[in-house]
């Protein structure tokens, strides 16, 4: 039987942790996943490595407020600000999902100073996949 490996301990108080290095990526891709409950904005380099991300919940919204266009706007602004620290200037946008924050997130990426190139909808379309949820009775 091999010897048990010890788990890496958390850094001690006062000990410096390794700082994330700043990448210099002028062109990237913004992936916006907008569901009925949340909006997640991820900005990657051309190879798909994540540079910055933000979501409606991460920005500070809880519950049904996460699904609002305003929450998506703040999430996109937050992700754009983080990405600009890494030198991102231009992004191609890939939108996925049926949520209400799709267009708002794209507009706020532009307003935050990122130049938006191509916009593509990559929402997966089922070829008659699983049965949809039953109709709501309110």
From Swiss-Prot:
The UniProt entry, under HAMAP family, shows:
Ribosomal_uS11
> From which residue to which does the signal peptide run?
none
Keyword Metal-binding listed: no
Protein name listed in UniProt: Small ribosomal subunit protein uS11
Quick one: where's region Disordered?
1-27
State the superkingdom.
Answer: Bacteria
Which keywords appear in this protein's UniProt record, sorted alphabetically? Ribonucleoprotein, Ribosomal protein, RNA-binding, rRNA-binding
Mind telling me which InterPro entries this protein's record contains?
Answer: Ribosomal_uS11, Ribosomal_uS11_bac-type, Ribosomal_uS11_CS, Ribosomal_uS11_sf
- The reply on keyword rRNA-binding is yes
PROSITE patterns to which the protein is assigned, alphabetical: RIBOSOMAL_S11
A single BP term in Gene Ontology? translation
Q: Which Pfam families does the protein's record reference? A: Ribosomal_S11
Q: Gene3D superfamilies per the record?
A: Ribosomal protein S11
- Provide the assembly information: Part of the 30S ribosomal subunit. Interacts with proteins S7 and S18. Binds to IF-3.
* GO molecular function annotation: rRNA binding; structural constituent of ribosome
GO CC, alphabetical: ribonucleoprotein complex; ribosome
Role of this protein: Located on the platform of the 30S subunit, it bridges several disparate RNA helices of the 16S rRNA. Forms part of the Shine-Dalgarno cleft in the 70S ribosome.
Q: Compositional bias of type Low complexity: which residue ranges? A: 1-12
Q: What family is it from?
A: Belongs to the universal ribosomal protein uS11 family.
């Amino acid at each position: 039987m091999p010897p048990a490996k010890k788990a890496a301990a958390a850094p001690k108080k006062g000990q410096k942790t390794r700082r994330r290095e700043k990448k210099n990526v002028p062109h990237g891709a913004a992936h916006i996943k907008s569901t009925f409950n949340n909006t997640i904005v991820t900005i990657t380099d051309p190879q798909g490595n994540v540079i910055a991300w933000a979501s409606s919940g991460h920005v500070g919204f809880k519950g049904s407020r996460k699904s609002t266009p305003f929450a998506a706007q703040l999430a996109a602004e937050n992700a754009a600000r983080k990405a600009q620290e890494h030198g991102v200037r231009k992004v191609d946008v890939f939108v996925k999902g049926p949520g209400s924050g799709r267009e708002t997130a794209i507009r706020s990426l532009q307003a935050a100073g990122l130049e938006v190139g191509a916009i593509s909808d990559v929402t997966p379309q089922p070829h008659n996949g699983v049965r949809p949820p039953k109709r709501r009775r309110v």
